[in-house]
């Protein structure tokens, strides 16, 4: 209780006692299956459109005959969104033997020409490479042009001059071939640094370069071999020497015109034009940078002079990496191999990229361990990248439960609380479908859509009906429904039609009906969008075998001859319990039960007395009144639609002593008008119509 000690006006907030219950979503869907790419560990990813699905999981694929029947998920996801589904979680199943494409990038310096190798009339000794980093007088280079499969190498030539203003490098002798920039890689003998920061050389420009880092596709699959990774040198900080500090060269303290974008641990290039040194920054104080390493000699740096070629430039050495796959592109700039916050390449790439991951191979010791593209800028991920060596088994789809965030397959959907609809498109084995049913029954608030097995080749007459009945007879649950036959879609991968499991499209219809009409409306007599036909035509007489209780097989029907398209023509669960035969009744109870569970959490640990019982009863009654007014419950008035009871008659003293609050709720769900019967008889004055 508050204390009132001094005369004043006290404004206090009070609890009104009314705790409204908000209805939960029933259209969030979870799919499990093989995809072209995407994460197979961690939490299933949410996608809200097919475009977003392709960004994470890729598009349609054909991994060859070994994986026939395991490529349904991308088509199902497309069908889900075509039928106006909006929230889809995907758990990727990884085939055995799948691996990620990768490459060990090399350091040193390899670059490209940005202008054809002849910069004068006729052949000359001038070239313009894409970068001058590490290139100085004495550096040896070799130009290699690969055009139309023909490889042309220049002689190994030494650099005799470097023009920083134009980027032109002078070689010791003229080139004997016109090296075209778009086809030419420039190999150098740049290797690393000595203890004083001077550039060391390889035995030759084509000698083996030091390993730099490993670049891998973000996840398994041959898609990674199509990744395009490019690396470019860049400098975040660029400065010109202004003066030494009191002539104290030995202290390695140098004043620059500007120290913008200089930072501790940056590798800087000390560029005198024809010679270069590289040092790390120990400190940046105003315009003064302090460098690591032995004392610098007087000739290593020079203040700004009249002659441009004598100016000493200080440039930080970073790199930019781009990764491109299909229409996706990522770019990371200002990267360093040193663990500099906000710049360290491992953190910057691995924490943000959906295309690649990088691994450091050794502690950085010099800036020429920056990755250098095999063709100057481009790095090919040429190792691994397998979609798998065998088709996934039932256990791969069912998955393993290693705890939160470590589950796989169907088990991974446990980590996503809001899922209400579950499907494993195209997988019809009894083990997998039993696992789906157990999953939904154990989690209570989920419903499984089961696919029919593929049609046999040249079956005897009636075999389809026998097959689907035999499949349905394996199950008895109020938490699943099965649909027959499979649908036919346009396969954009092959420009032909193909039969497809219907669960993805039907899950989209569930979501569409939930959003537009409500979960109490049966997801039947609804158009299936995005299809061109059905694998088998089922007529009314055949449906009279499949539909009645306890068979309860939902049929997809072709009504195009009646100008009504292709429709779902069934709304039953695969159960022998007549009370739960309708899908919408089961899912309405899921909606109401979960909404009450979530909406009454506030009552836990409240004093368990009449006041609490009244408040909880009021909250539930107000919620059920809204449900009734939406048309989900029978009755012309609320008392006929539901009752809520929470008092001494629902709890014993033992219940109270053990902390139990027990409420009894009864509802009268609306059931679908599955059989519309019009009875007509003769009447002297006209006709009489009775609708039941």
Task: Name these PLM-found stretches.
Residues 1-107, 133-137, 142-152, 163-164, ...:
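Structured, hydrophobic secondary-structure cores that serve as assembly/anchoring elements
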Residues 192-213, 388-417:
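Short linear interaction motifs
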Residues 114-115, 154-160, 203, 224-232, ...:
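Short amphipathic beta-strand/extended segments with alternating polar/hydrophobic composition
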Residues 361-406:
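Long, low-complexity, polar/charged, intrinsically disordered or flexibly structured peripheral segments
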Residues 237-240, 342-346, 685-692:
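Short, cationic low-complexity segments
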């Amino acid at each position: 209780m508050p204390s009132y000690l001094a005369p004043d006006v006290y404004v206090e907030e009070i609890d009104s006692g009314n705790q409204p219950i908000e209805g939960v979503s029933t259209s969030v869907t979870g799919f499990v299956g093989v995809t072209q790419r995407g994460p197979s560990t961690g939490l299933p990813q949410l996608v809200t459109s097919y475009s977003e699905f392709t960004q994470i999981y890729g598009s349609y694929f054909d991994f060859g005959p070994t994986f026939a029947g395991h490529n349904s998920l991308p088509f199902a996801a497309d069908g889900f969104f075509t039928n106006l589904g909006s929230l889809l979680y995907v758990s990727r199943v990884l085939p055995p033997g799948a691996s990620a494409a990768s490459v060990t990038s090399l350091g040193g310096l390899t670059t490209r020409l940005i202008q054809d190798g002849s910069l004068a009339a006729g052949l000359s000794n001038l070239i313009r490479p894409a970068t001058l980093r590490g290139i100085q007088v004495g550096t040896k280079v070799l130009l290699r042009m690969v055009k139309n499969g023909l490889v042309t190498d220049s002689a190994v030539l030494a650099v005799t001059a470097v023009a920083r203003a134009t980027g032109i490098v002078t070689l010791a002798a003229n080139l004997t071939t016109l090296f075209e920039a778009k086809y030419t890689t420039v190999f150098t003998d740049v290797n690393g640094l000595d203890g004083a920061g001077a550039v060391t050389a390889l035995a030759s420009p084509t000698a083996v370069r030091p390993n730099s880092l490993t670049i891998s596709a973000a996840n398994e699959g041959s898609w990674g071999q199509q990744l395009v990774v490019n690396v470019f040198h860049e400098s975040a900080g660029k400065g010109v020497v202004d003066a030494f500090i009191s002539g104290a060269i030995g202290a390695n303290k140098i004043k620059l015109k500007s120290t913008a974008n200089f930072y501790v641990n940056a590798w800087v290039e000390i560029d005198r034009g024809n010679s270069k040194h590289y040092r790390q920054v120990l400190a940046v104080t105003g315009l003064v940078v302090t460098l690591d390493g032995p004392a610098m000699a007087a000739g290593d740096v020079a203040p700004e002079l009249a002659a441009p070629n004598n100016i000493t430039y200080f440039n930080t050495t970073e790199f930019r990496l781009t990764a491109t796959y299909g229409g996706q592109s990522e770019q990371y700039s200002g990267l360093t191999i040193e663990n500099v916050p906000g710049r360290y390449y491992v953190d910057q790439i691995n924490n943000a990229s959906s295309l690649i991951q990088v691994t450091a191979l050794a502690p950085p010791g010099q800036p020429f361990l920056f990755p250098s593209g095999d063709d100057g800028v481009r790095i090919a991920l040429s190792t691994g990248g397998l979609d798998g060596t065998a088709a996934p088994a039932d256990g791969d789809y069912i998955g393993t439960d290693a705890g939160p965030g470590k589950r796989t397959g169907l088990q991974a959907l446990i980590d996503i609380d809001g899922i209400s609809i579950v499907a494993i498109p195209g997988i019809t084995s009894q083990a997998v479908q039993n696992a789906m049913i157990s999953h939904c029954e154990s989690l209570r608030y989920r419903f499984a859509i089961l696919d029919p097995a593929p049609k046999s080749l040249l079956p005897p007459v009636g075999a389809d009906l026998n097959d689907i009945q035999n499949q349905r007879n394996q199950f008895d649950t109020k938490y699943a429904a099965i649909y027959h036959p499979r649908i036919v879609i346009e396969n954009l991968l092959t420009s032909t039609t193909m039969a497809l499991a219907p669960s993805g499209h039907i899950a989209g219809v569930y979501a569409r009906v939930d959003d537009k009409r409500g979960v109490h409306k049966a997801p039947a007599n609804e158009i299936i969008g995005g299809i061109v036909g059905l694998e088998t035509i089922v007529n009314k007489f055949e449906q009279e075998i499949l539909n009645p209780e306890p068979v309860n097989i939902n049929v997809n029907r072709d009504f195009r001859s009646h100008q009504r398209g292709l429709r779902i023509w069934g709304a039953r669960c695969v159960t022998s319990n007549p009370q739960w035969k309708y899908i919408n009744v089961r899912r309405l109870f899921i909606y109401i039960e979960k909404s009450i569970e979530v909406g009454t959490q506030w009552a836990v640990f409240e004093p368990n007395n009449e006041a609490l019982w009244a408040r909880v009863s009021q909250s539930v009654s107000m919620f059920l009144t809204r449900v009734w007014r939406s048309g989900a419950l029978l009755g012309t008035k609320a008392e006929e639609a539901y009752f809520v009871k929470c008092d001494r008659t629902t709890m014993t003293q033992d219940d109270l002593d053990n902390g139990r609050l027990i409420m009894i709720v009864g509802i009268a769900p609306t059931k679908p008008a599955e059989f519309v019967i019009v009875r007509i008889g003769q009447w002297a004055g006209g006709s009489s119509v009775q609708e039941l």
